[in-house]
From Swiss-Prot:
Span of the signal peptide: none
Organism, scientific name: Mus musculus (Mouse)
Limits of the BTB domain: 30-131
Name recorded for this polypeptide: Zinc finger and BTB domain-containing protein 4
Residue ranges, compositional bias (Gly residues): 242-255, 467-477, 552-565
Compositional bias (Acidic residues): 604-627
Keyword GTP-binding: no
Major site of localization recorded for this protein: nucleus
UniProt GO MF annotations: DNA-binding transcription repressor activity, RNA polymerase II-specific; methyl-CpG binding; methyl-CpNpG binding; protein homodimerization activity; protein kinase binding; RNA polymerase II transcription regulatory region sequence-specific DNA binding; zinc ion binding
Cross-link (Glycyl lysine isopeptide (Lys-Gly) (interchain with G-Cter in SUMO2)): K40, K548, K590
Region (Disordered): 71-103, 234-255, 404-578, 591-700, 715-738, 759-839, 854-880
Post-translational modification: Phosphorylated by HIPK2. This phosphorylation reduces stability and triggers ZBTB4 protein degradation in response to DNA damage.
Tissue expression from the record: Expressed in adult and aged myogenic satellite cells.
Length: 982
C-alpha cells in the first residue's frame, strides 16, 4: 500500500501569525485586554495561551467553564487525551449560572514599553532591540519580562541583570513550537499541570470571577474582594488558588517542577500600609504614602488605589486606565460630550460644573459658591454643613438602565427574554415575569429611579400631576444626597401655568418601572407629609433666592446667549424660579410666574373670572414672598438684582390708561397696565368680557366706607385695614405695616410704595376731572354736602386769616370762585361712591379749623429781626412776599380731630407716623404773647410734596387784621420763610 500523499505549506504558519497580528492591531476579534502600566493592549487569548505558560495558567484560572475531570492514574492515556481534547474543543452548552470571563487582565509591575516589545515578538516572531542592543537596561528589562512570562527565546536577554523576577520553568516549554501552538505531536508531562490542577479543583459550583490572590477565596463583586484583601494578612509564600488548585504544591506538581519556580498568579500587589491615629477621641486612618487622613477605613482603601497599580477602570474610547471609577467617568465625558450638570432653574445642561456655575452667575444672578461656603472670622471661607445644590447630576447615558435592578450580592438569576427584547405593538398583552418586588419602607417615589445613586433629585410630593410627567424623568436615584421637594400646600391647577418640561428618555412601557409612577399620583400631599415627619422640620429662618430667566421677557424668539448648548431651539424663555431655603431643611422650589407673563401674545379662551382670581393669587403670593425676604434680611447672604415686576419705562405713561397705542401689534401691554385696565373705576365704562359680565363691575361694597370692590378677597383685605390689621399672619413672619390706597383696594407695605401707586391713578386720567376741594367754614357748622365748593385742582394750599376776619370775608368768598383764604383747603380727596344712589354722609365738621397761616399787608413789612433770614423757596417766597406780615394761630383747647383715612388722604403727604399728627395740630401759639412762629407744615414733618403736580395757583390775598406787635417786626410766615425752613 503506497503511503498517503501529503501537501505541506511552509508559509502557512507565518501567514496565519501575520493575519493574527493584523487583527490585533485593528482590534478585530480581540477577546482580552492586557493592562501594563497605564496602557491597554488588546490581544487574543488563544495566541497568548499558546505562546506563554504564564498566560495559559492565568487564562485557565479565569475561564468560565472548567476542563473535564481526569480519572485514573498520574498520566492520561492517549484515548483519554483525545477525548478530553475533543470535548474541550467542542462548545459546551451554556450554563445559566456561568458568568462571562473577565476581559481585562492586569499585569502589575510590568512596564508598558517592555511589554509592547514582547507582545510584538509573540505575534510576529521578531524583536527589535532598543538602541540596537546597546541599551543594556532596556534589554535586561525585556529579558526579565521574558523569563517571567516563560518565553524561552527571550529568557537569555540580559541574563542576571534583574533579580526581581523568578526564572521561568524550562521544563514546561517544548522545543517544537508546533507541539505547543497547534496541539499536535507527543506531549510532555509538564504540559498537563494545568489540566491536572483543574481536575483537582472542585467544580460542583460555578466559578466566581474575583478570587483573592493570597488565600484563594473568591468573591462576586470586586468591592468585596478589595475589602477582603485589606484584612487578609497571610504570608507571601502562601500560594493562592486563583490560578492553580490546592493540589499543586512543592511535591504535588509534576516531576522536576518546583512550585516556587512556577509563574506567579495574576493578582494585585500589596497596597501601602496605613497608620491608625486617635486624635481627640476620633480614630483617623492615615495613608502611608501621602499622609492623608480619613475617618473611615473604606475611604482609605478607596484612596489607596491611587498609589497602587490597581488600575481596573480602562477608558472605553482610548488607551487610558484609571484607578477610580469617577476618574474614568470624568474622562469619558470628554469623549461622549454628555451634559450631565443640569441647572434647576432653566433645565439647561452643561458638560462641567464650571460651565454650570458660570451660567448661573451670569444668567440667574446666583453665585453657588456662597451657598457652599461661609466666611470665617479671619476672612477666609469654610465649607457649609448643609449646602444646597442648585444643580442635578444626570446619570450617564452609557451606564443608564431602563429599569431598577435589585442586587442582593448573589449570582444573578437568568433574566427573562421579555425584559431584554421589547414586545412588538401587535402582540397582545400577556403576563410577563417581573423582578422581585422592591422593599417599601415609605411612600413610593414619584420619579423613575435607577440602581445607581444620584447626588440630587427632585421629588414631586404635593402635585399629583407632576408625578405623571411634570418633572424630568429619569434623573432620579435610589439614594439622594440633597432632595428638592415640592412641600407647598396643594392648590387647584391653573390653566395658564407654564407647561411641564419635556421628559427625558425613560423606560419602555413594558418595563416595570413605568408602573411605579401610578401609585405616586394617588399619594398626593401625603408623600410630602410622610417625608416631612422624618426630617425633623422646624420653623426656622429662611433664605430666599430669586433667579431670573435665561432669555429676555420680549418673547421675540431670541435665543439666550452663552448657555453652552443649542438653546436657539427654544422659542420662549422658561419660567422664573424662586427658591426659599429653610435652614437645616430642604429647598422649596416655587414657580410663581405664569406662562402669559413670559410669552406675550393673545389671551387663551379661559374665563375672565378665573384669570382674575389667578392674578389675584399671584399678586398676593408675590407680596408675601417679598415680605418674607424683607423679614429675613439679616439672614440673607446676598440679594439678586432681579425683581419679578418689570420697571416702567419713562415713556410708558404717555399712553394713558389704555397703554396699548404705543405698543407694536401682536404684543400685550405690561402686566401692571392690564390690571389697571381690568379694575375699571366707575368713571370708565365697563368692558364686556367673553362671559357677558363687565370687567369694571363692582358688586361688593364695604359697610364702613361704602367703597366697592370687584372680588370678595379685595373686600376682605380692605375690611382688615378698617379693623386695624387684625388679620392673622403666617407663622414665623414679622407683622408689616399696611398702607391702603384710598382710591382702590391696593395695600402697600411702605409709604413710598403707596406714593408711587397713587401716581398711577393720576397718570391714567390725563387732564381728566378736576380734583374736588372740600372747604369747611367756621360759620357753617351745620352745613352739609350742599355747601361744598369745587375749586381748581391744586396740590396743597394752606392759608388762613385771624379769627376776627372770618365773618367779614364771607362776601368776598362768595363773589370769587378761587380758594377761600379764611378756610383750610383740603385737596386731593375724592368723593367715595355710595351704594343705592344715596348721598354720602360726611364726618362731622370741625369746630375750629386746622393750623391757619395768614398774613396782612403792612407798610413796614421789610424790617425784621436779625438772625431770622432764610429762604422758603422761589415759588413759595414770591407768593408770600406780597402778603405782608403773617401770623400762625393755634387754639389752646383740644378739639375733636378727624384724622382717619378720610382726612389723611386729602393731604398730598405720606403720613407714616400717625402718632405725632394730633400733637402737632394741637400746638399752642398765642397771638399776643410773642411766641415763636410754627414752621411750615412740610418743614415740621419732612414730607415731600408730589413733584409731578402742577404748582399751585396763588389766590388773590385778602386784607387781614394787623397784629398788635407787627408794626416794626416780622411775624408769622415771614419769619418762617426767613429762618425756620431749610
Amino acid at each position: 500500500m503506497p503511503p498517503p500523499a501529503e501537501v505541506t505549506d511552509p508559509s502557512h504558519a507565518p501567514a496565519v501569525l501575520h493575519q493574527l497580528n493584523e487583527q490585533r492591531l485593528r482590534g478585530l476579534f480581540c477577546d482580552v485586554t492586557l493592562i501594563a502600566g497605564d496602557t491597554k493592549f488588546p490581544a487574543h487569548r488563544s495566541v497568548l495561551a499558546a505562546s506563554s505558560p504564564f498566560f495559559r495558567e492565568a487564562l485557565l484560572a479565569s475561564a468560565p467553564l472548567p476542563l473535564p475531570p481526569v480519572t485514573g492514574g498520574s498520566a492520561p492515556s492517549p484515548a483519554t487525551t483525545t477525548a478530553a481534547s475533543s470535548s474541550s474543543s467542542s462548545p459546551p452548552p451554556a450554563s445559566p449560572h456561568s458568568s462571562s470571563p473577565p476581559r481585562v487582565l492586569e499585569l502589575p509591575g510590568v512596564p508598558a514599553a517592555a511589554f509592547s516589545d514582547v507582545l510584538n515578538f509573540i505575534y510576529s516572531a521578531r524583536l527589535a532591540l532598543p538602541g540596537g542592543g546597546g541599551d543594556g537596561a532596556a534589554v535586561a528589562e525585556i529579558g526579565a519580562l521574558g523569563r517571567r512570562l516563560g518565553i524561552s527565546r527571550l529568557q537569555g536577554l540580559g541574563e542576571g541583570g534583574d533579580t526581581w523576577v523568578p526564572p521561568a520553568p524550562t521544563s514546561m516549554v517544548t522545543s517544537d513550537p508546533t507541539e505547543d501552538g497547534l496541539g499536535a505531536g507527543p506531549r510532555t508531562d509538564g504540559e498537563w499541570v494545568g489540566d491536572k490542577a483543574e481536575a483537582l479543583t472542585p467544580d460542583s459550583q460555578p466559578r466566581r470571577p474575583f478570587p483573592c490572590p493570597r488565600c484563594g477565596k473568591s468573591f462576586i463583586h470586586p468591592k468585596r474582594l478589595q475589602t477582603h484583601e485589606a484584612q487578609c494578612r497571610r504570608g507571601s509564600n502562601t500560594r493562592g488558588s486563583a490560578g492553580l488548585g490546592p493540589g499543586v504544591s512543592g511535591s504535588g506538581g509534576p516531576a522536576g517542577v518546583d512550585a516556587s519556580a512556577l509563574p506567579q498568579p495574576v493578582g494585585f500587589r500589596d497596597g501601602p500600609e496605613h497608620v491608625v491615629k486617635v486624635v481627640g477621641g476620633h480614630v483617623l486612618y492615615v495613608c502611608a504614602a501621602c499622609e492623608r487622613s480619613y475617618v473611615t477605613l473604606s475611604s482609605l482603601k478607596r484612596h489607596s488605589n491611587v498609589h497602587s497599580w490597581r488600575r481596573k477602570y480602562p477608558c472605553r474610547y482610548c488607551e487610558k486606565v484609571f484607578a477610580l471609577a469617577e476618574y474614568r467617568t470624568k474622562h469619558e465625558v470628554w469623549h461622549t460630550g454628555e451634559r450631565r450638570y443640569q441647572c434647576i432653574f432653566c433645565w439647561d445642561t452643561f458638560v462641567t460644573y464650571y460651565n454650570l456655575k458660570t451660567h448661573q452667575r451670569a444668567f440667574h444672578g446666583i453665585s453657588p459658591g456662597l451657598l457652599a461656603s461661609e466666611k470665617t472670622p479671619n476672612g477666609g471661607y469654610k465649607p457649609r454643613l448643609n449646602t444646597l445644590k442648585l444643580y442635578r447630576l444626570l446619570p450617564m447615558r452609557a451606564a443608564k438602565r431602563p429599569y431598577k435592578t435589585y442586587s442582593q450580592g448573589a449570582p444573578e438569576a437568568p433574566l427573562s427574554p421579555s425584559l431584554h427584547t421589547p414586545a412588538p405593538a401587535a402582540m397582545p398583552a400577556s403576563p410577563q415575569p417581573l423582578p422581585p418586588p422592591a422593599p417599601e419602607p415609605g411612600p413610593p417615589p414619584s420619579v423613575i429611579t435607577f440602581a445607581h445613586p444620584a447626588p440630587s433629585v427632585i421629588v414631586h410630593g404635593s402635585s399629583s400631576s407632576g408625578a405623571a410627567g411634570g418633572g424630568p424623568a429619569g434623573t432620579g436615584g435610589s439614594q439622594a444626597a440633597s432632595v428638592i421637594t415640592y412641600t407647598t400646600p396643594p392648590r387647584p391647577p391653573k390653566k395658564r401655568e407654564y407647561p411641564p418640561p419635556p421628559p427625558e428618555p425613560t423606560a419602555t412601557p413594558t418595563s416595570p418601572a413605568s408602573t411605579a409612577v401610578s401609585p405616586a399620583t394617588a399619594a398626593g400631599p401625603a408623600t410630602a407629609t410622610e417625608e416631612a415627619k422624618g426630617r425633623n422640620l422646624r420653623a426656622g429662618r429662611t433664605l430666599t433666592y430669586t433667579a431670573k430667566p435665561v432669555g429676555g421677557l420680549s418673547g421675540s424668539g431670541g435665543s439666550p446667549t452663552g448657555t453652552g448648548r443649542g438653546s436657539s431651539q427654544l422659542q420662549a424663555p422658561p419660567p422664573l424660579c424662586q427658591i426659599t431655603v429653610r435652614i437645616g431643611e430642604e429647598a422649596i422650589v416655587k414657580r410663581r410666574i405664569s406662562e402669559t407673563d413670559l410669552r406675550p401674545g393673545e389671551l387663551s379662551g379661559e374665563e375672565v373670572e378665573e384669570s382674575e382670581e389667578e392674578e389675584e393669587e399671584e399678586e398676593e403670593e408675590d407680596q408675601e414672598e417679598q415680605e418674607e425676604s424683607k423679614a429675613g434680611g439679616e439672614d440673607q447672604l446676598w440679594r439678586p438684582y432681579y425683581s419679578y415686576k418689570p420697571k416702567r419705562k419713562a415713556g410708558a405713561t404717555a399712553g394713558g390708561a389704555s397703554g396699548v397705542s404705543g405698543l407694536p401689534r401682536g404684543r400685550r401691554p405690561p402686566r401692571w397696565r392690564q390690571k389697571l385696565e381690568r379694575r375699571g373705576w366707575e368713571e370708565t365704562p365697563s368692558v364686556e368680557g367673553p362671559g357677558g359680565r363687565g370687567r369694571g363691575e363692582r358688586r361688593h361694597r364695604c359697610g364702613d366706607c361704602a367703597q366697592a370692590f370687584a372680588t370678595v378677597r379685595k373686600l376682605r383685605k380692605h375690611q382688615e385695614a378698617h379693623s386695624g390689621g387684625s388679620h392673622t399672619s403666617r407663622t414665623g413672619r414679622r407683622s408689616s405695616t399696611r398702607f391702603t390706597c384710598p382710591h382702590c383696594a391696593k395695600v402697600c407695605k411702605t409709604a413710598a410704595a403707596l406714593n408711587r401707586h397713587g401716581q398711577r391713578h393720576a397718570v391714567e386720567r390725563p387732564g381728566g376731572t378736576p380734583t374736588p376741594v372740600i372747604a369747611y367754614s367756621k360759620g357753617s357748622i351745620g352745613t352739609r354736602p350742599t355747601d361744598v365748593k369745587e375749586e381748581a385742582p391744586q396740590e396743597m394750599q394752606v392759608s388762613s386769616s385771624s379769627g376776627e376776619a372770618g365773618s367779614g370775608s364771607a362776601a368776598a368768598a362768595e363773589a370769587s370762585e378761587s380758594a377761600s383764604l379764611q378756610d383750610p383747603v383740603i385737596s386731593g380727596g375724592e368723593e367715595p361712591p355710595v351704594a343705592g344712589g344715596g348721598s354720602y354722609v360726611y364726618p362731622p365738621v370741625q369746630e375750629f379749623p386746622l393750623a391757619l397761616i395768614g398774613g396782612s399787608r403792612e407798610p413796614s413789612a421789610g424790617k425784621g429781626k436779625p438772625g431770622n433770614e432764610g429762604s422758603l423757596g422761589a415759588s413759595e417766597g414770591d407768593r408770600m412776599e406780597g402778603m405782608g406780615t403773617a401770623k400762625v394761630t393755634f387754639y389752646p383747647e383740644p378739639y375733636p380731630l378727624v384724622y382717619g383715612p378720610q382726612l389723611l388722604a386729602a393731604y398730598p403727604y405720606n403720613f407714616s407716623n400717625l402718632a405725632a399728627l394730633p400733637v402737632a395740630l394741637n400746638m399752642v401759639l398765642p397771638d399776643e404773647k410773642g411766641g415763636g412762629a410754627l414752621p411750615f407744615l412740610p418743614g415740621v414733618f419732612g414730607y415731600a410734596v408730589n413733584p409731578q403736580a402742577a404748582p399751585p395757583t396763588p389766590p388773590p390775598p385778602l386784607p387781614l387784621p394787623v397784629s398788635p406787635k407787627g408794626i416794626g417786626g416780622m411775624t408769622g410766615v415771614e419769619r418762617t420763610q426767613k429762618g425756620d425752613v431749610g
